[in-house]
Amino acid sequence: MIKNVAVGISGGVDSAVTAFLLKNKGFNVTGIFMKNWDIRDETGKCAVEKDYEDARWICNKLKIPLIQVDFVKEYWNEVFSDLIEKYQTGYTPNPDILCNKNIKFNKFFDVALNRFQADAIATGHYANTSFGPYLENYKEDTNVHLLQAHDSSKDQTFFLNQISQETLRHCMFPLGNYLKNHVKTIAKEAGLHKIAQKKESMGICFVGKREFQDFISEYIDDKPGEYIDLDSGLSIGKHNGIHKLTIGQRCRIGGGSKAYYVFNKDQKTNTILAVCNILNEKNQDFIVDKLKFLNHMNNTVSIIQVDSTIHPALYSDFLITQDIHWISEEPRELRCSGVLDCNFRFQHRNPLITCNVYKISDNRLFIRLSVPLRAITKGQVIYGT
């Protein structure tokens, strides 16, 4: 029997309405404010302090207790340090995914259940589970599945792809079946006008109002290297560090008339392979020929088809992935036949692309996409059909 629910209160409208809905359902609700970062902005005002003031105002209005927990050390060690380490190797990780995995659905989960004796946790994420928004369909002997939110424009399941089965079994997502404008209406009806009108936070919490590259440069020293043209193999300029650019991003090369884009980054040589988006017939045929590949699954040869104004090296209709994380378990269809029809996404809000997944080994998958995608990077998510 679920009675006590710990709600992550951020000071925003989504978590406020989450707490309001839970209280109206009759749960004993406790608000938990997570302090993950304490840097001050340009005015000397700590953004966390302002958010905490709003969180306290919300809980006073709803007549529920609010407890602040300090995860600054944990965030530094398990999110920020990991982020910096990966940037130094040339990989561009997603801090929201790291935070959800290691802090919100790990440390917060442990504190809520073990220190505050909560039966479940709840957040203002736009997501659903097979157990229902209030765990009303909870079954002890059944795995829970993460499901997309009703509001596809706000769906946040992409950022929740690394959370564990054990945590998800005790998670409530009351906003999973609501549209964003309805959530704001509920907030106003609940007397939370101040929060309903609050500007939505879209940035990374530790960056503030600064440009991300200016921020990251405080922690990673510049390390100049060469831009190498993929077609010619010649140097076309110098960069200040592979951490400053990601796959598919336009290169910062001064003096040239052509636009170059990052194809790949080599940490060992500190070079960035770049491609130009202006192709003539000769080098286009050469590049496309290099991008032929043998599909070992059905012994056919495929060629990537792309718009001639964009370099085909940036596009791919297949990938091989490893370090797979199944939230529930490996699908029975994949276990039995080695093939799974599903959907693919590698960036938040990108449309789902149909794909076929082939099992190579216990920890490796070959994914064939129905259409070529540009600049695929690490961190892909597959969704059931």
What residue spans do the PLM features occupy?
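ATP-dependent adenylation/nucleotidyltransferase module used to activate substrates
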Residues: 1-161, 188, 262
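AMP-forming adenylation/ATP pyrophosphatase catalytic core
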Residues: 122-128, 133-385
